[in-house]
A protein has these predicted regions:
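Short, well-ordered alpha-helical segments in soluble proteins
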Residues: 94, 108, 123-127
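C-terminal accessory module of base-excision DNA glycosylases/AP lyases that mediates lesion recognition
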Residues: 1-50, 54, 116-178
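Small-residue hinge/turn detector
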Residues: 97-98
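Short helix-capping/linker segments at secondary-structure and domain boundaries
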Residues: 62, 112, 177-178
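Cytochrome P450 catalytic-core helices
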Residues: 103
Length: 178
């Protein structure tokens, strides 16, 4: 049964995606910078996760006053997967958009997917209206629900068990699928 988050999906294309997925991501463990960043994250240092994510994505490091740092840390700690509503407040910070927030949340939780324009285009091709709008946290929320739907719908052999977050495998697979 197809999850509600995948309502309208081209079922044949979705099945073809899952058949191809293991080969599409078989080199995921070769991305040393991603793996080093992923395993550099420590449980109770959520503001450090922001630095790690920014470094991994080659972004300029943040330079916020202490009150903003505390606010960001509070939002990161209180946001519960898959809800992205609390993250909207972070979009008011200079240089922060849904793409950047998704990277922070991915490295902080290993649950949230990294927002990707290529992945959104593949989801669109599968019949799932999933716009890529980095200036709109709701569009990221829709992307999160689509990825969660794919996780729920994945056949046993569709998601390789290679020790990396399933959301990362799906994101990479969607980016590489043709």
């Amino acid at each position: 049964m197809i999850p509600v988050a995948l309502y309208g999906v081209d079922a044949a294309l979705c099945e073809r995606f899952f058949e191809a997925l293991p080969k599409l991501v078989n080199d995921a463990y070769e991305d040393r910078s991603y793996i080093e960043a992923l395993y550099a994250v420590e449980a109770d240092h959520s503001i450090e996760h922001v630095r790690i994510a920014d470094q991994w994505s080659n972004r300029d490091p943040y330079a916020w006053p202490e009150d903003i740092v505390n606010e960001v840390e509070m939002v990161l700690r209180t946001t519960v997967y898959p809800d992205v509503a609390l993250l909207e407040h972070l979009m008011t910070l200079d240089g922060v958009d849904a793409q950047r927030i998704s990277e922070w949340m991915h490295f902080s939780t290993n649950l949230f997917p990294i927002y990707s324009e290529k992945a959104c285009k593949t989801l669109q091709a599968m019949g799932l209206d999933t716009p890529y709008r980095p200036d709109d946290i709701a569009s990221y929320g829709l992307y999160v629900s689509r990825i969660e739907g794919l996780k729920l719908h994945a056949p046993a052999a569709g998601l390789p068990e290679i020790g990396l977050p399933r959301t990362r495998m799906l994101q990479l697979g969607l980016e590489r699928f043709e």
